């Protein structure tokens, strides 16, 4: 498997982007890329999550509204490949650890939060593959800081205009 990756320079370069995510190994990246045909079949992350079976379905009939659950109609190989990386990510990934800890008290079953982390990992892999960039652990913090700066700037501007 590693020899095939080394033979294709572009594939090797793009897999390095995915491996920059803590908890994603060469094997996991290769399985996801092989099962999704290099993400070439998808135009957005929502299509990808649906393909993998991470989409949510509702059971409804008339006035009855059942619980929502994961469809599992998608690719079981990707879900199986992302299970262990998700468990590792909640321990070592600086972005996914707070995400997991925030969801954990809200959910009755711990597996629900692990599946949410799996979905987030998959979307992150898709984004890095499409944008051809390495994982940046501070990306979320930088984004929040930019939004806070804009909000503060707007408040100051509004106070100045009303004065």
Label each PLM-derived region with a short phrase.
Residues 1-163:
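A detector of single, family-specific signature residues
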């Amino acid at each position: 498997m590693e020899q095939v990756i080394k033979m294709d320079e572009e594939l090797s370069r793009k897999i390095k982007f995915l491996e920059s995510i803590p908890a994603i190994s060469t094997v996991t990246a290769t399985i996801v890329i092989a099962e999704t045909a290099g993400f070439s079949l998808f135009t957005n992350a929502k299509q990808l999550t649906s393909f993998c079976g991470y989409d949510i379905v509702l059971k409804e009939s008339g006035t009855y509204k059942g619980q929502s659950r994961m469809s599992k109609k998608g690719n079981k190989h990707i879900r199986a490949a992302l299970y262990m990386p998700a468990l590792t990510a909640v321990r070592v990934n600086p972005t996914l650890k707070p995400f997991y800890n925030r969801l954990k008290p809200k959910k009755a079953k711990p597996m629900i939060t692990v599946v949410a982390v799996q979905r987030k990992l998959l979307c992150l892999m898709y984004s890095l593959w499409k944008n051809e960039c390495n994982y940046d652990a501070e990306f979320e913090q930088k984004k929040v800081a930019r939004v806070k700066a804009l909000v503060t700037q707007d408040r100051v501007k509004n106070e100045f205009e009303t004065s």
